[in-house]
Amino acid sequence: TSGGVEGMVSVRQLITKMVSGLTSNDLTSLKKYLDSDESTIADDATSIEYSYSVSPQIYRQDPDGSVHQVNPDSTLSMLGLGSSGSGSTSVTSSLMNSMGSNTSVFYQLPANSDLYKSQYEVKAGRWPEKPTECVAVLSKYGTVTDYALYSMGLRDSAELDKMIQQFAQNQNVDVPSDFRTYSYDELMGLKFKLVNSADTYVYDDTYGIWKSKADDKDYMQQLVENGEDITIVGIVQPDYTASASMLTSGIAYPASLTEKVMKLSLIHISEPTRH
């Protein structure tokens, strides 16, 4: 209501108007409403962000031809620590609790760049301009995590695998002590490979089923080899004058990459790979 009684707080009907008349979980209609001129949510929000349960399948290809999935990171599951057994679950939980949110090196940037760009200083390169470009985000101290080094291929991932195995088996962990600093040039231009997750399945005409080829080493190496390059084109660090910083340390890709992945999946459904 307009006006109001002095000393009293009135209620502005925002969410109730938004959802009234909408079918429960009718997300299509909800998004249509939010994007329409009828919506008043823009009066109270800086930006409207949409998130999807889609995570780009990103791989690192080493010089010897071997491939490693770095997003979503498969390190723990590949070592048998992601199974349902109580022992492995306990180990995984312990690792996750110790590392916090840092188990995910890659993440999506907010679609609205105005939300974060002013908070950061570009130390090298630039912000992503294409879906297949990403940026290395440093901490306010100008650091990256050791975990990120393994994902980027700047340290041998076998070293990480060994440490996790030792930890899981309650052995003394051989922790490396030879960490060094890295120049911006060593991070700039690092490349990863984008794989359409749907392409890890092929359709078997004989049995009429989709078969996973994720465990087929040769198939996956070829699939990754043919994947699009994802390239680090910039390095950013929180500006010392910023009162807050939205992004976390890691490798951030644009929202347009998520949209690209969804479109690729739809194409695969209409034109399946047959075997």
PLM features: residue spans?
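Short, solvent-exposed coil/turn linker segments
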Residues: 75-77, 182-183, 272
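Residue-level detector of conserved catalytic or cofactor/ligand-binding positions
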Residues: 267-275
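Hydrophobic secondary-structure segments that place a key small or acidic residue at a functional site
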Residues: 23, 98-261
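Hydrophobic, regular-secondary-structure patches
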Residues: 1-132
